[in-house]
């Protein structure tokens, strides 16, 4: 099963190939995608992305996880989250969201089992 390509990104809107949903923030993994609802884990810009935010994607068996910090990189990624991913043997890439989408799509094209969590506003 391959990871779906991110078809488009603009402020507050993301489209994933194979999904009719327009996402504000989203999670993607081999074979699927869904809304990333920060309320599920109490996530805020700071301290930022928590292990609980990425756990679902990790459990899908990804080799690499790309984190999009927002268009202005307002979303933090604490070292505890990076350590959690590394402990699970996952290569992690933390980037500004436009760059993160480019990196994610390049990895998809290479056939990597890649997942991602992306914030499409600030």
Swiss-Prot record:
Keywords: Cytoplasm. One of its GO terms (biological process) is positive regulation of transcription by RNA polymerase II. GO terms for cellular component: cytoplasm. InterPro entries: AAMDC, MTH938-like_sf, NDUFAF3/AAMDC. The keyword Cytoplasm applies. Residues 6-122 are annotated as: MTH138-like domain. It is found in: Cytoplasm. Its main location: cytoplasm. Belongs to the AAMDC family. May play a role in preadipocyte differentiation and adipogenesis. This is Mth938 domain-containing protein. It comes from Homo sapiens. The gene is AAMDC.
């Amino acid at each position: 099963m391959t990871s779906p390509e991110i078809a488009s990104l603009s402020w507050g809107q993301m489209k994933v190939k194979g999904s009719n949903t327009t996402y504000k923030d989203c999670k993607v993994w081999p074979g699927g995608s869904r809304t990333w609802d920060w309320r599920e884990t109490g996530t805020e810009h700071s301290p930022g992305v928590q292990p609980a935010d990425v756990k679902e994607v990790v459990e899908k068996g990804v080799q690499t996880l790309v984190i999009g910090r927002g268009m202005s990189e307002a979303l933090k990624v604490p070292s505890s989250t990076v350590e959690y991913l590394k402990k699970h043997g996952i290569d992690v890439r933390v980037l500004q969201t436009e760059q993160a989408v480019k990196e994610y799509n390049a990895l998809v094209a290479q056939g990597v089992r890649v997942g991602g969590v992306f914030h499409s506003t600030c």
